[in-house]
C-alpha cells in the first residue's frame, strides 16, 4: 500500500475511534471528518484501491475507472424510448386471486386480517378527520385514500425496530405499528397529549417508541437524513434497516440525488420507497419526468430496484421483505417504486377537480382500490364475510369517534412550552424571551383565547 493510502486509512481509523453512535463525532471527530471529507470517506475502500491498480497494456479494452463498458466505433446516442419499461411486480390480480402460487407469501389468517383492519381503520380515520377540517375543527389534513396498501404492506415487512422516515402520507405505517388513535388525534388537534406539544401542523406525526422519525414539511429533506441514519446503523452493526418514503414529485428534488448517491457509495442498509401516485399536488407524472419513472433511476446509481403494484398489498410486502433481508445482510440500498393512485385531494388546501376528471378518480376508487382487492382475497378464502365487514365498519368508526371526541375536549399546551426542548438547559436569552411572552399575555390576555390553553 502506498503512503497516501496508508494516511487515508489512518485518518479513517482515527475517525472510527472517536465516533460513537451514542454521542456523535465529538470535538475530535468533526475536524477529522472535515479533513478527510465526505468524498474521501465514501470512495476509500482498501480492497477497491488494490483492485484498481491492475492495469493491462496487452489489450485495447477501456481502462477508465468511471464505468465498466466496451469501446464502439459507431456514433450512437442511447434512446430512452427504445428501452423497455421496468415491469410491475404483482401477486394478486384485481379480483384478489393469487396469480403465481410460488409468489404467495403464505401469511397466517391473523396477519392478513391485521393488514385489512389497519387499512380500513386508516380509511375511516381519514374520512372523519377530513370532515373535521371542513367543519373548522382542525386546521389542515391530508388523506391516504388509495395508498393504504403501500403503507401496510411495507410496514408489515419491517422489523419493529427498523427506523422509518416518512414524507407526510404514511400514516398507515404508524397505524400498523399500533400507534394509538388517541395520539393521531392529539397531533392533529395539537392538544396537551400531542407528543410534539402542538408545535407541528397536523399529520406531522412522530414517535420514538415506534421508531418513526417526526415528519417535516420540506420535500425530500428526509432522504439524505435517512441515508445518514442508515450509515450510522451500519457502523454500529445495529442489524436494522432504515426505510425512507417519498413521492415521485419529491424524487425530482436535489436531495433525492444526493441521498441515492451517498447510499450507493457508502453501501447503506436503506430502502428507498417511492409512492408513485400519479400526481405531485397538481403536477401529473407526464410533466414530472420524461424517463421510465423512478425505479429506472436506481441502476444508474448502482441501486437494486424494483417496480411493484402498490395496490397489491402482498406484492408490496414481498418486495419490502426481500429488500429488508438483503439490505441488512449485504449492506446495500434498495429502491422500490410502488405504482398507485392518489384518490383523495392532495390536502384540504387542494381541489383536484381543477386538474383531473371525476371519471378518472372514480375508476381507481371503484375498480382498483387496494382495500377492495384485499377484501376479495379474504372473502375467497373464507376469512371474511359481509356480516364481519358490517360489524367491523361500525366498530372502527366508533373507535375513531371516541378518540376524536376525547382529543377535542383537551386543552392546548401552555404557550410557554414553545421555548422548551430547544436546548437541554434553557440559555439566558431564551429564558428572557419566555418571560417577555408571559408579561405580554398577562397584560393583553383578553385578546387571546387563553381559556383553550393549559395554565
From Swiss-Prot:
**Which residues of this UniProt protein bind thiamine diphosphate?**
168-169, 217, 249-250, 275, 346
> Keyword Phosphoprotein, does the record have it?
yes
InterPro entries per the record? Alpha-ketoacid_DH_E1_comp, DH_E1, THDP-binding
Binding residues for K(+):
216, 218, 221-222
Briefly state the modifications made to the protein after translation: Phosphorylated at Ser-347 by BCKDK and dephosphorylated by protein phosphatase PPM1K.
Please list the tissues where expression of this protein has been recorded: Expressed in kidney (at protein level).
Q: Which domain of life is it from?
A: Eukaryota
Protein known as: 2-oxoisovalerate dehydrogenase subunit alpha, mitochondrial
Q: What is the lineage of its organism?
A: Eukaryota, Metazoa, Chordata, Craniata, Vertebrata
